[in-house]
UniProtKB/Swiss-Prot annotation:
The gene is ppnP. Keywords: Glycosyltransferase, Transferase. Pfam families: Ppnp. It catalyses: a purine D-ribonucleoside + phosphate = a purine nucleobase + alpha-D-ribose 1-phosphate; adenosine + phosphate = alpha-D-ribose 1-phosphate + adenine; cytidine + phosphate = cytosine + alpha-D-ribose 1-phosphate; guanosine + phosphate = alpha-D-ribose 1-phosphate + guanine. Belongs to the nucleoside phosphorylase PpnP family. Catalyzes the phosphorolysis of diverse nucleosides, yielding D-ribose 1-phosphate and the respective free bases. Can use uridine, adenosine, guanosine, cytidine, thymidine, inosine and xanthosine as substrates. Also catalyzes the reverse reactions. SUPFAM superfamilies: RmlC-like cupins (SSF51182). This is Pyrimidine/purine nucleoside phosphorylase.
Length: 93
């Protein structure tokens, strides 16, 4: 089953699905700034564009480009700065 999700008044849209027992989502973020909370650990991969990320405990912002990934701890949060529309893959670990 595919589930459509909309966050931040339409600024972020994703399609969530399960593949071989693993929950996954793919989506697009419009330019803007966002804070996401996590329940489970996540691996985020930038598909097209760039995400500027600051996770809990990080001192500095880090830019991840197309093809690059970053992990986020469960029961945590992370801040994002998006300069232009960016596509991503989120794997729930």
């Amino acid at each position: 089953m595919i589930k459509e999700n909309t966050y931040f008044e339409g600024g972020v849209k994703s399609l969530a699905f399960n593949q071989s027992g693993a929950d996954v989502s793919v989506g697009v973020m419009a330019a803007g700034e966002y804070t996401f909370g996590t329940a489970a650990p996540e691996k985020m991969t930038v598909v097209k564009g760039a995400l500027i990320v600051k996770r809990v405990g990080d001192d500095d912002w880090t830019t991840f480009q197309s093809g690059e990934s970053f992990d986020v701890a469960g029961d945590s949060s992370f801040d994002l700065q998006v300069k232009e529309a960016t596509a991503y893959l989120c794997e729930y670990l």
